[in-house]
Amino acid sequence: MTQTMIHYQDQWPVVTGASSGLDRGLAPLLARQRAAFLRNGPPSLAERRANLKKLRAALLARRADFEAALDADFGHRSRHETAIMEMLALTWGIDYLHKNLRRFMRPERRRVSLPMRFARARVEYQPLGVIGIVAPWNYPMSLALTPLATALAAGNRAMIKPSEFTPATSDLLVSLIAETFSEDEVAVVTGDAAVGAAFAALPFDHLFFTGSTAVGRTVMRAASEQLVPVTLELGGKSPVLVDRGQPLARVATDIAYGKLANAGQTCVAPDYVLLHESEVEAFIEAWTKGVAALYPKGPASEDYTSIVNVRHYERLRGLLDDARAKGAHVVETGPSPEHAKRRAHTLAPTLVLDVHDDMRIMREEIFGPVLPIVTYRDLADAIGFVNARPRPLAVYYFGSSTENRRQVLTRTTSGGVTINGTLLHYVQDDLPFGGVGASGFGAYHGIEGFRAFSHQKAVFDVRRWNGGALLRPPFGRLTNFILSFMLRQARTTSGVPIEVRNAAVIHASIERVWDLLTDVERWPSWWRACRWVRLEPPTRAASVVFRWKAHPVELRSAVVKSDRPQCFAITADGRGVHAERTFTLRPTPDGSSTVVVSHETQVGPLPWLGRAFLAPRLHAVNQTMFEDLAEAAGQVIDGGRAI
């Protein structure tokens, strides 16, 4: 296949339809892949696993080549950083897919509605067809091949468009894919910005894009012309929230690692840190020591990565110049860029203090080794600061308070969260990875990635007896009876409560009956008379849990009144169902016996739940209860009489 080159830019030209002419080589390639997909059908489990094995073996065989190519593309990049951040993460992901693929492919059974209960319902996961993958320059190997591995696992074919900013890596991807797969299975397309726009405008079955929010808008606009579903993995300003009183030596080192890996050119890199106003100086000291421990020679260290090119380097310098001009205090760690003479476009680890929203550095995604510090007075201020900005791709929280952690998790919205660390949620293969709002939508990794590249086909299998046929014309008395029964059940359980009252006289003192009645270990046996209900043994009266065997709905109960020894009441709620049971105890005139009155009401929206709580069954439950009390405390003088 003839190869050209593509530029990764802040804006792409908009290409609609097939009018540009640039797609004349792309559209036939897409057509060949789609024809092969339709001709051969979905690949089997064995074929998908074989493709994953081929990809993994090819990667490991070219490891040294990729390390050299990325070093050349960045001006300098540690081979260990490439091996860890790209090769290792990618092979872990492939191994995860290989291991779990059988489970992912398995059809999922679903519930069948009552009139057709003898039928079968399931969801089957079907390959979409041809997946388009647009990869960025910051991790050009893993961010091209991780979605490819997921697409292959889901049974698809794929076309990849890598970035022009990393030409050596792009050329290596071309040769690796050509040696491993046929062109109608996987192909790599290179070209300039116009080719990239034409690629995004192709009628793929799904388009996966990783890159900036600005380009993501252009890609989505182009895909919408063809009604192509998209997954957008974008960026954003991912905050680090450091709770007060944390061990700053460890915290600062963890933040420095997340910020300085790949020189901050990571979509989930910490973009700014929120510190309590009393801890800024201590953090700066801890940061300086942490950076020195990670990179003893500062930006001249062998393990420290350069900025990808002069253009991006100058953009970062422009952010710092703008911040200085507007009153920020800039603190560089290690030699300044001018003294890092061993390599070009290398930026020192940098802190920026006294920042405000008028600065570009607080409005734009930084994507470099520059970390602004924002101070807060209390946690609510910090959370409000995060929520006042577009939703980020990641949030990082350092803290030991369970309550504060829960506040951060529930009151902020982000693509993902790592607690007491940075970056690490990305490499958890069983967790979905994706953005929200301006940081993207859709997710990959885990079963979510497999399903993103699959069509979730609903399959309903009608068996020999079909209850739905009873509701076909000609309508008559049977139809009226069925409708009357079904609609009455729904009405009864949604609005009109079921009410049951029973009473019995137990030959025992009121104190003795009270003790037996509130002994929660006895309660499960009372419900044996109701075959739809199982009451699990509770540990205490306030933690009773009802479980309906016919449906995984839980009805949790709590004691709402306990006036010893006259009155005891519990309520139960779940899925719109509300139940209330009150036990009233009063002694007979001579005090030798006790009258026990049970009054229960049930109301809820589910028809089957109404059947489970029909009055006769509740009467049977009460009868069982009274018999148990009598056996333990004396004889029943007038047992289980409905009143």
Predicted regions and their residues:
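Beta-strand/loop substructures that line and gate deep hydrophobic ligand-binding cavities in soluble
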Residues: 573-624, 631, 640-641
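N-terminal Rossmann-like NAD(P)+-binding subdomain of aldehyde/semialdehyde dehydrogenases
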Residues: 26-122
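Hydrophobic ligand-binding cavity/cleft-lining segments
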Residues: 492-537, 643
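ALDH superfamily catalytic-core signature
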Residues: 181, 214-356, 419, 476-481
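Conserved C-terminal structural/oligomerization subdomain of aldehyde/semialdehyde dehydrogenase
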Residues: 241, 339, 346-494
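Conserved glycine-rich cofactor-binding loop
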Residues: 12, 19-20
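NAD(P)H-binding Rossmann-fold N-terminus in SDR/SDR-like oxidoreductases
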Residues: 21, 25
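Rossmann-like NAD(P) dinucleotide-binding subdomain of oxidoreductase/dehydrogenase enzymes
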Residues: 113-250, 376
